[in-house]
Amino acid sequence: AYSFKKQGKTEEMIIEYERILDSGDRDTDTLRDLASAYGEQGRTDEQVSVLKKILSFDPNNSAIQSELARVYESSGEDPLEIFKARFEDNPENASYAIEYAQKLMDNGDIDEAIDALENTLSYNDSNNMVYLTLGSAYNENSDFNEAIKTLEDLFELDRNNYRVAIKISENHMELDEFDNAYEWASKALRISKNNAESLSHIGNLYYKAMNACRGDNFSRSDKAVASLAYSYFTQAEAKGNSKYFKQKRWLEENDVLFGRADWFMLDKDIQTTGKVSPAGRCYDWVSESVTKQSDW
């Protein structure tokens, strides 16, 4: 068989390997070569059968488990059971846990994904990717408080990761906790040194807060927050991030930005300061102001 393999005579090699297989040989390398040869010829069913045979006497062989999963995926079949077996045989392996959890989430089995990740976290309590994937699973499960706790633990491990701060902020936004969301968004902005992604996130935070707080008619405070959102969207766009271009366009087209007419409706003592701040309990976390424009 080895001679045929060296000569590139695949058919002859397969015949020889099949003869060895029929003899009951349990040599993993031999059977793996046979599986590869089947794969080269597109004989997927036979390839799967041989790989499964290897696992029947060597069930913890992670390399064969991975190979079988790859074959399943390339043939369009669901390899979930393979990923599950590999994870259960190696619960301390973070990569296997993450891959299995991702497959579960793709199938909508979020609770099972969370269980798998929490299990492996006991072995990998300093693995950033486990925390990040678990945080995403909690978020998909609408368990935003647990997502926040998990991501805060991750932030303690990686305090210079502005994207983790943004994710924590996003989960607070899901709970309409805009004060906490702003605190984490500000951290992201400081860590990233005002990069485009962090700027666009704060713009979206203001945009969502405005929509959560406003009534049927836009108050001056609603318009002030809308203008803050617009300002951040514009800054992010200037740095190449147009993620929220639809929201920015909506603000432009719906007469919700604080403008000249709104300015002249303000009390004189506010006009004297040259800026206006949002007011009201819903906006009591907003510390920024809208500055008077030159044409007001």
Where are these regions (language model features)?
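Canonical tetratricopeptide repeat
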Residues: 1-2, 6, 16, 29-36, ...
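TPR/TPR-like (Sel1-like) alpha-helical repeat modules
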Residues: 39, 44-62, 69, 73, ...
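Residue-level recognition of tetratricopeptide repeat
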Residues: 27, 61, 93, 127, ...
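Terminal, low-structured helical/coil segments at or just beyond the last alpha-helical repeat
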Residues: 85-92, 235-296
